[in-house]
């Protein structure tokens, strides 16, 4: 079966009831298997490991693209979240509950998202659908 849906930043596939949907090509730049601070296991195991700003697909390949990019930008200072999960900065490593689960953005996040949108529209067929999810908290 040819995959007709691309999830460009699938992460832990929390967007899906069926995490093995045969119609979806799951892509993420990360591959992670760990346990979260509350003891739950968490896995990022994409079909394709690739960067959403430079995707390895031909133009007009998918009838639907799901774009749920990393959205963690700030978690610093003396906040409760920083106490619980740590904080991010330009030198942060991919550790800590929130960074592992949600991915992180850095100072060039606007350019990164613009490149991601350009790639999503490039690989989407004419008349296709783009589902964009963003969280600004």
What name fits each language-model region?
Residues 1-137:
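Class I S-adenosyl-L-methionine-dependent methyltransferase catalytic core
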